[in-house]
């Protein structure tokens, strides 16, 4: 698969994720996304979060510009925090076919309450 977003100033936000071959499947890879925003599905108010992605590759690595553009698509979307962690996990698993992958979404406090949601995938042996 050719990388079409990296180095392309015309690349637009969409839900496609690009990957590249990676030989060392013993690696543990961590990606922190510190500027995530979406909206409350009830009030429409903005929510801010940090998203952490930890994965052991199954032969594919995640190209991070495509991840950035993917995450931008949620900016105006109303979604419950718990649903977001699972949706991102499912999309990443479909793109990467990893050995293991965990998505943790840490939302900033609202009304004095902070919420974190994690969703994990493990390939069956």
Swiss-Prot record:
SUPFAM superfamilies xref list: Tetrahydrobiopterin biosynthesis enzymes-like
Positions that bind substrate: 62-64, 81-82
Biological process annotations from GO: queuosine biosynthetic process; tRNA modification
Molecular function as annotated in GO: preQ1 synthase activity
EC number: 1.7.1.13
Record Pfam families: QueF (PF14489)
Active site residues per record: 40, 47
Involved pathway(s): tRNA modification; tRNA-queuosine biosynthesis
Origin superkingdom: Bacteria
Family named by the database record: Belongs to the GTP cyclohydrolase I family. QueF type 1 subfamily.
Protein name: NADPH-dependent 7-cyano-7-deazaguanine reductase
Organism from which the protein derives: Frankia casuarinae (strain DSM 45818 / CECT 9043 / HFP020203 / CcI3)
């Amino acid at each position: 698969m050719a990388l079409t977003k990296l180095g392309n100033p015309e690349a637009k936000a969409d839900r496609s994720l690009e990957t590249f071959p990676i030989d060392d499947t013993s690696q543990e890879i961590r990606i922190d996304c510190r500027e995530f925003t979406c909206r409350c599905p009830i009030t429409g108010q903005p929510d801010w979060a940090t998203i952490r992605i930890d994965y052991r590759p199954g032969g594919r690595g995640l190209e991070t510009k495509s991840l950035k553009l993917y995450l931008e698509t949620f900016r105006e979307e109303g979604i419950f925090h718990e649903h977001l962690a699972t949706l991102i996990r499912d999309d990443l698993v479909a793109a990467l076919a990893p050995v293991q992958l965990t998505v943790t979404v840490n939302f900033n406090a609202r009304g004095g309450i902070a919420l974190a949601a994690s969703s994990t995938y493990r390939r069956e042996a």
